[in-house]
From Swiss-Prot:
InterPro entries the record matches: EF-G-like_DII, IF2_II, IF2_N, P-loop_NTPase, Small_GTP-bd, T_Tr_GTP-bd_dom, TF_IF2_bacterial-like, TIF_IF2
Keyword Cytoplasm appears in the UniProt entry: yes
Region G5, annotated ranges: 559-561
The keyword Cytoplasm belongs to this UniProt entry's keyword annotation: yes
Organism name: Leptospira biflexa serovar Patoc (strain Patoc 1 / ATCC 23582 / Paris)
Region (G3): 469-472
Positions contributing to GTP binding: 423-430, 469-473, 523-526
Protein name as it appears in the record: Translation initiation factor IF-2
G4: annotated segments: 523-526
Pfam families documented for this protein: EF-G_D2, GTP_EFTU, IF-2, IF2_N
UniProt domain tr-type G: residue ranges: 414-587
Region Disordered, residue ranges: 1-312
Span list, region G2: 448-452
Alphabetical keyword list: Cytoplasm, GTP-binding, Initiation factor, Nucleotide-binding, Protein biosynthesis
Amino acid sequence: MEEQKSIKETLQQGASGDKTKKKLVIKKKAAPSDEKKESSPGAQGQTTATEAKQSSPASSDKKKDLNELIREEAKRQGLGSGPQAPSQASPIVSRPDRKPEPLPQPDREKAPMDRKPESILSGDTSSPNFRSGGGQGGGNQGYFRKEDRNPIVSRPTTPRPPRPEGQTGGGYQGNRGPGQGGGYQGNRGPGQGGPGGYQGNRGPGQGGPGGYQGNRGPGQGGPGGYQGNRGPGQGGPGGYQGNRGPGQGGPGGYQGNRGARPIGQGGPGSGRPPGDAPFGAPGGLPGAGGPGGAKKRVFDKEKGGREENENTKFFKQSFRKQKAQAAALAAVPKEISILENIQVGEIAKKLNLKPGEVISKLMKMGMMVTINNVIDAETASILADDYGCKVKIVSLYDETVIEEEKDAPEDYITRPPVVTIMGHVDHGKTKLLDTIRSSRVAEGESGGITQHIGAYQVETERGKIAFLDTPGHEAFTSMRARGASVTDIVVLVVAADDGVMPQTIEAINHAKEAEVPIIVAVNKIDLPAANPEKVRQELSNYGLQPEEWGGTTIFCDISAKSNIGIDKLLEMLIIQAELLDHKANPKRKAKGTIVEAKLDPGRGAVATVLIQNGTLRVGDAFVAGVHAGRVRAMYDDLGRSIKEAGPSFPALVTGLDGVPDAGAPFDVVIDDKEARTISHSRQEYERLGQSKNAATRVTLDNMSEIIKQGALKELKVIIKADVRGSTEAVKEALEKLSTADVRLNVIHAGTGAIVDSDIILASASNAIVIGFHTRANPKTVSLAEKEKVEIKYYSIIYDVVNEVKASMEGMLEPEKVENIIGKVEIRDVFKISKVGNIAGCMVKSGKVTKQAHVRVISSETGEITWEGKIKNLKRMKDDVADVLTGFECGILLDGFNDFSVGDEIEAYEIREIARKL
């Protein structure tokens, strides 16, 4: 009865609005099947230490009666109707628009509970459901099973009245103004409000249970917050993963270090503003300070965070590096195109790699390089293969391809054939062309030998034919190869009296490589020694079977000198061209090939261009090899000025900024700007390909080779010729003369007249200057005499090769040849003091001279025991120069006395013979 009276007084005090008294304790009746009692969240958070002591020793029946009395008394007095009365027995209010939904009941066997309600109410911290830490009051709400928590009470069916200002319920993830309700993830303003906010800060006041993951301001509030800081107060159980401020509260928090409780009472009292709080629970008095240790926990957390960040940073950097490497490898193309030589920076760009990575790779391969060094194609292939990339070696012009135009099919017309005349030297190629043109071309050639390619267009009864006349000398291999590459038909001229020769075979190979048909012209059939059948037999061994023998090759017996069979040859050419049916579009920009180029004293750089497609006109901008220009004037093969040149027309073009290489492509472009851009790119690639600083592997073998090469004898020359093709031919012929003992080094090769710069270069490098079909002016000749530079002029390539060869042979060390001149037998040995042993000899064969070299051969072993010179030779008592066969003589050797009777002395001479290349 005393307990009932105490409770009654408590309820009356709460109804009268006394804020400083103890909180109302409301217990919910447990289900009959439950073995344990559970208090509501509000009651747990607001149970004082005195009430916990009063309720802990009571029996189960007594508690049941007490709870019923509390509920009946609360209903009778109508709590919540007054301005200061608490709103509900439970902080979770019912809602009128929804039916109550009971919480699911978990299986008790799966979640056993070894504590008793008494231990909760009494603040027993020895229970395994609590962590260590001081304080009394309610336990940690996060540790209770769902079935032990206060279930949601039924909600009234009547409509819910609007909330007045100051009484608003808790918001969700927002800021909560001053009032009573519990907010969720928001800041809770000061007031008496209901349950604690979730993940938000709770302002000072007397409110309900603690917030979740938020800070709780000072006050007397309910249970501790979750993952947040709790302000000073008397509140309930400790927070979860957060720091608990000073207060009297319940058991310690979770996952936090809880230090010793500070001395003294809790923080300030309630800061509740005036007004109704129907949804809030009454606040309590400030209690003793809560557990400390927050700073230590934060320090440990921050320290661990720093260590984790350092490790994470290391692994992230490694991961990023591996990812970058994988991305770099993925960016490497499957195939790249390069020239014979390529810069390190350029190949790195083609491989989509950083130059530093490529340099590092090359250094591992034993090559000391920088970004500007040049490596050869072989090294580049090995480097690219390590990255899974294939290398394709291309020419200079493949690297700078000019975009092709699209031709309309209706614009195509049949173009005249391009015929190249090939064969061995002096087999009558130029004479044949002379007969066809009815001109005197052959007489204009030096020595009757063609020195460069001639391009002509001939008008016949059956149509036009473009002819290219190539040199037959072995030095002009490159010219013949170019002629075969731009031609449609090859006419192979073979002399009937001479048969197949080396250049004949070479011409056959060039034509087969170019995949062009061959028509054989058997020339000089009017000579008595002519044997056309022998020529057919020899050519059949090289795959050229005559049609009359069942083959596919056309043979024409002709005589260029007597004009025999020429018409038949032209007819065969036209028939073959009709079968090939080559087309071209005269409406497009011109495209062709440089047949020949030279530096003309009056017109500058000029080039013979064979137009293969399109039409070339005066004023067109073009790119010729590595040079650019604009057509200033054009001339035909007879020297007449023309305005345009169509397909299969050879034209002489002026307006180039340099002398292009023979065989270089000729392309008309849009304007001068594009021409210069392409020209500069090609010149850069050309310099790169000719670079002398190509990196090499650093090995002892290379060093030995360099040392050996330094001892080589070397002849240095500078070559100047009238046309580029002749320059190439002379250079190629001379470079073939190099041997292991003497080497020919072409310092410079160019076209045009010999100028002062050539003389200065020759003087500095100790070279001779060779002029082929070109000369030096008087001023340059005077400079050469002053600098003591030799200039040689030639018009026939035979003379160039023979004289240079003789000069190189003179640089060779002569070959020493041993010649035995006599043999002498030793028949006696005379010992003379102060002189030595003298051999008494008989000359058995030849003769022995005082100047001869001799060797002593032992009669016992047959081995040579000594070699040297004769010091003195005597016949009787007289000194003699030589002794012939059958005569006796005395021989004193220079420095040798250990010979015996029966030994043989062999006399020989050493002659020096000039070596040949």
